[in-house]
Design a protein with these regions (language model features):
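Nucleotide-activated chemistry modules centered on ATP-dependent adenylation/adenylyltransferase
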Residues: 1-204
Length: 204
């Protein structure tokens, strides 16, 4: 598979610079499932970062338990999802509002974790096929693979993957399938439309 070869080359390039990474993971989404499997084999220290909106949802914990068994040397940290800060600030869907709530971005969270954990490089599962914004961002990189930002020390091994290729990798390597919700849509990990999240908001 051409895309698998490309992803491994991207990871190899970064592994020559560092043996430790932050890996932002949705805990059950298909892209994250593939990303962890690829990176675990190449880095001595893999810190899996899960950004939660609601802690300890059942489908999230199923994948967490699976991953800790399959990849025993991973470290795991949970931090609030940046969307949660916006929800609190605006009182979205009835959540208790705090107009003074500071807003955080993914970049802010990454920098905070870098300082806290002493890990410089960060890995994300973004793909060009996800959206126009991601396609434009990834194609702006000059690494030759449209996947590594050497200046910011961020990399995206799945940059040129398509969803079918992601699922083929999961099947070929016999990894845990991504969760499916009641509408048969595959899980992307944390989804603000998830029924458990909506129930959580109503209780606040």
């Amino acid at each position: 598979m051409q895309e698998l070869k490309r992803a491994r080359e991207i990871i190899d390039d970064v592994s020559k610079e560092t043996d430790s990474i932050l890996l932002f993971h949705s805990l059950s989404g298909k892209d994250s499932i593939v990303l962890l499997d690829l990176c675990y084999k190449k880095f001595k220290r893999v810190v899996v970062v899960f950004m939660y909106i609601v802690k300890d949802l059942e489908h999230i914990m199923r994948y967490y338990n699976y991953a800790k068994t399959k990849y025993p040397n991973i470290e795991f940290v949970q931090v609030p999802h940046y969307a949660l800060f916006y929800d609190i600030k605006t009182g979205y869907m009835g959540i208790k509002q705090d107009p003074k709530q500071r807003q955080w971005t993914l970049a802010d969270i990454t920098e905070k974790l870098r300082k806290r954990l002493g890990v410089e490089w960060a890995c994300y599962g973004f793909k060009q096929s996800d959206s126009l914004n991601r396609r434009l961002m990834l194609r702006s990189y000059t690494d030759g693979k449209e996947a590594i930002n050497w200046k910011t020390k961020k990399f995206y091994p799945l940059s040129t993957y398509k969803n079918k290729e992601i699922m083929d990798y999961i099947l070929d390597h016999r990894l845990k399938n991504p969760e499916a919700n009641g509408t048969n849509k595959q899980s992307s990990g944390v989804d603000v439309e998830d029924i458990e999240y909506q129930k959580f908001l109503l209780l606040q």
